Amino acid sequence: MAPTFYHYHPLPMDQKEPGCGIRWRCLAAASVLILVALVIPLIIFAVKANSEACRDGLRAQEECSNTTRLLQRQLTRSQDNLAQAEAQASTCNRTVVTLQDSLEKKVSQIQEKQALIQEQEAQIKEQEAQIKEQEAQIKEQKAHIQEQQVRIQKLEGEVEEFEQKLKKLRTAEEASITSKQNSAGSMAVSSLLVLAVPLFLLF
C-alpha cells in the first residue's frame, strides 16, 4: 500500500483553539469569585467597623455633649458662687472699713483720754508738791508757834516772878516807909513796869 500523508491546513493566527477561551473564562470567573469571596468579608468587616466606629463616635459625641452640659452647669454655678463671693467680699470690705473707722475713733478717744489722764496726773503731782510744801510750811509755822509758846511761857514766868518781887517790894515799902516813901515806891513800881513792858515786847 502506498503511504498516506495527512495534510493539515494551516490555521490563521487569529483563530485559537476553543478550549483556550473556556480556560480563560473559567480563570476569570474563578478570580472573580475569589475576589467576591474576599471583598464581601472585607465589606462586612468595614461595615461593622464603621458601624462600631459610628456608635463609638455617637457615644463619644453624647459623652462630650453631656460633659459640656455638666461643665456649663458647673461654670454657671461657679459664676454664681463667684458673684456671691464678690458680694460677700464687698460686704466684708464695707464692714472692715466701718470697723477700721470705729477702731480709729476709739483709738483717738483712748489717746485723748490718756492725754487727759496724763494732764490730771501732772496736776495731781503738782498739787502733791504744793501740799508737801504747805505741810513743810505748816510744820515750820508749828515749830515757830511752839517756840513762841515757849517764849511766852518764859515771859509769863518772868512776869510772875516780877509781880512777886513787886509784891514783896510793896509790902516791904508799906511796912517801913511812910506815905511819902509809899508815893516814891509807887513811882518806882511804875518805872519798873514801864521798863518791863519793852522787855516783854522785845522777847
From Swiss-Prot:
Show the coiled coil region(s). 66-178
Q: Which InterPro entries match?
A: BST2 (IPR024886)
Propeptide found at 184-203
Cytoplasmic compartment residues: 1-26
Extracellular topological domain ranges are 48-183
**Positions glycosylated per UniProt:** 66, 93
- Post-translational modification note: The GPI anchor is essential for its antiviral activity.
The molecular function GO annotations come to: metalloendopeptidase inhibitor activity
Q: Which GO terms describe its biological process?
A: defense response to virus; innate immune response; negative regulation of cell growth; negative regulation of cell migration; negative regulation of intracellular transport of viral material; negative regulation of plasmacytoid dendritic cell cytokine production; negative regulation of viral genome replication; regulation of actin cytoskeleton organization
Q: Show the stretches that span the lipid bilayer.
A: 27-47
What this chain does, per the entry, is described as: IFN-induced antiviral host restriction factor which efficiently blocks the release of diverse mammalian enveloped viruses by directly tethering nascent virions to the membranes of infected cells. Acts as a direct physical tether, holding virions to the cell membrane and linking virions to each other. The tethered virions can be internalized by endocytosis and subsequently degraded or they can remain on the cell surface. In either case, their spread as cell-free virions is restricted.
Q: What is known of its domains?
A: The extracellular coiled coil domain forms an extended 170 A long semi-flexible rod-like structure important for virion retention at the cell surface and prevention of virus spreading.
Q: Assembly and interactions?
A: Parallel homodimer; disulfide-linked. May form homotetramers under reducing conditions. Isoform 1 and isoform 2 form homodimers and also heterodimers with each other. Dimerization is essential for its antiviral activity. Interacts (via cytoplasmic domain) with ARHGAP44. Interacts with MMP14 (via C-terminal cytoplasmic tail). Interacts with LILRA4/ILT7. Interacts with RNF115.
Name of the protein described by the UniProt record: Bone marrow stromal antigen 2
Whichever gene encodes this chain, its name is Bst2
